[in-house]
Design a protein with these regions (language model features):
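Glycine/aspartate-rich loop-and-adjacent alpha/beta segment that forms the canonical ThDP
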Residues: 65
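Short cysteine clusters
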Residues: 59
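Cys-dependent protein tyrosine phosphatase-like superfamily
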Residues: 1-56, 68-124
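Substrate/cofactor-recognition hotspot
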Residues: 62
Length: 124
């Protein structure tokens, strides 16, 4: 799952990923703000898809957008306390100036997210 905006790198990545039989998903998020409700709903829906198998989530640095998404997943799926999820994100490199993302993780409530049915995989 690529959290970067679509560009030449993501097109090349998609080709490489699908070329080895895996599924590529792009959910572009800005690096400047926490995810929207629509973005986090789509992301958690994809991460909760039992048929998807292991999922590799990344952004540019793999710390701020990725850290926020994985923290929300930890709270939602693993039933972690928000503080624990934030500590993990910070220990894995979330930038200390990412105050809006930190606030998002501290206040994220899984009950406010209504997951959709997982999308059917497309053929590579």
């Amino acid at each position: 799952m690529d959290l970067r905006k679509r560009d030449k790198r993501s097109v090349a990545e998609e080709k490489a990923v699908t070329g080895v039989g895996m599924r590529y998903v792009n959910v572009p998020m800005t690096g400047l703000r926490p995810p929207t409700e629509a973005e986090i709903t789509k992301i958690l829906t994809l991460l909760e898809d039992d048929l998807a198998g292991p999922v590799f989530v990344h952004c540019r640095r793999g710390a701020d957008r990725t850290g926020t998404v994985i923290a929300a997943y930890r709270v939602h799926h693993d039933h972690w306390e928000n503080r624990r999820a934030l500590r993990e994100a910070m220990s894995n490199g979330m930038n200390f100036i990412q105050l809006p993302r930190q606030h998002y993780i501290r206040t994220f409530r899984p009950a406010s997210i209504h997951l959709e049915a997982a999308p059917k995989p497309s053929s590579p």
